[in-house]
């Protein structure tokens, strides 16, 4: 992240993010949110653009409240506080993909669900349909494919149901984002 921060040209990064969003929309996809691009969007030089693009495109910027590892933590927490003050939806916590072998996947997620703190937790999942991805990222393909199969089989839904955890989904959070902010044109 230090290298990204040193070489970041905020205007160029914002233009690239706009191009990616525009290309996604032009392809007919319906994105719901803007992730933090492996925390790059949390850098102080890009954070305001991340939120602004969320406003402009009606996409919820994923900036969980309890993150302690954000680069530029003061700027990050100020941005989250501003979203809170404006009544915008902010996730409380974040948990992510478990890069584990098949036999550890269900028990791992059972432990994650059992330990969820109170509030809204964003699950950053990286499930991938088995196929060509193995040729792109061989080291990641196995656990991404396993996560896809496990999620498609209802594994996470069953654990959440059993634990009384309500699943919301980013489409619902996007709707809250769009209705809680300034009118878009």
Feature locations, PLM:
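Terminal accessory/targeting
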Residues: 3-29, 33, 45-185
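Active-site pocket-lining segments that scaffold enzyme catalytic pockets across diverse folds
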Residues: 38-43
């Amino acid at each position: 992240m230090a290298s990204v921060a040193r070489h970041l040209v905020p205007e160029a990064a914002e233009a690239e993010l706009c191009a990616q969003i525009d290309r996604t929309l032009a392809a007919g996809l319906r994105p719901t949110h803007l992730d933090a691009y492996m925390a790059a969007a949390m850098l102080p030089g890009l954070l305001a653009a991340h939120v602004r693009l969320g406003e402009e495109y009606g996409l919820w910027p994923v900036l969980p409240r309890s993150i302690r590892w954000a680069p530029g933590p003061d700027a990050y927490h100020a941005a989250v506080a501003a979203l809170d003050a404006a009544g915008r939806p902010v996730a409380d916590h974040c948990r992510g993909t478990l890069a584990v072998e098949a036999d550890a996947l269900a028990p791992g997620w059972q432990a994650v669900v059992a330990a969820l703190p109170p509030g809204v937790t964003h699950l950053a999942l990286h499930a991938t349909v088995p196929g060509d991805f193995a040729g792109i990222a061989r080291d990641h393909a196995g656990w991404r494919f396993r996560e896809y199969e496990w999620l498609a089989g209802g594994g996470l839904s069953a654990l959440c149901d059993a634990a009384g955890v309500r699943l919301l989904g980013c489409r619902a959070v996007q709707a809250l984002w769009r209705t809680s902010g300034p009118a878009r044109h």
